[in-house]
Swiss-Prot record:
Protein name: NAD(P)H-quinone oxidoreductase subunit 3, chloroplastic
Transmembrane segments: 9-29, 64-84, 88-108
Alphabetized UniProt keyword annotations: Chloroplast, Membrane, NAD, NADP, Plastid, Plastoquinone, Quinone, Thylakoid, Translocase, Transmembrane, Transmembrane helix, Transport
Chief place of localization: plastid
């Protein structure tokens, strides 16, 4: 009726893929020596003791640039498969992709006008 047996390999893969990290953490928790002390709790970077606090504040501009980059990176991920199969999909999918790009361009213009892309 529903041919659920065709998904057996998927469920097997999913179970094995879930068990491997669980077993890895479990085995390392059992076999790893437990040593707590001040050296274990101190900050460490490249073999050198840090000079000063470990917490730094970053300007919000870095986050805005990263956010705009991620949006257009995801756009590329969505548009590449569409471009590779454009001849099969037809005109309706072209219109949908055009609307998708138009929405992203509107967002880019909004970010530009708000000054999110200004570095100084």
């Amino acid at each position: 009726m529903f041919l659920l047996h065709e998904y057996d390999i998927f469920w097997t893969f999913l179970i094995i893929a879930s068990l491997i990290p669980i077993l890895a953490f479990w085995i390392s928790g059992i076999l790893a020596p437990v040593s707590e002390g001040p050296e274990k709790l101190s900050s460490y970077e490249s073999g050198i003791e840090p000079m000063g606090g470990a917490w730094l504040q970053f300007r919000i501009r870095y986050y805005m640039f990263a956010l705009v980059f991620v949006v257009f990176d995801v756009e590329t991920v969505f548009l590449y498969p569409w471009a590779m199969s454009f001849d099969v999909l037809g005109v309706s999918v072209f219109i949908e992709a055009f609307i998708f790009v138009l929405i992203l361009v509107v967002g880019l213009v909004y970010a530009w006008r708000k000054g999110a892309l200004e570095w100084s």
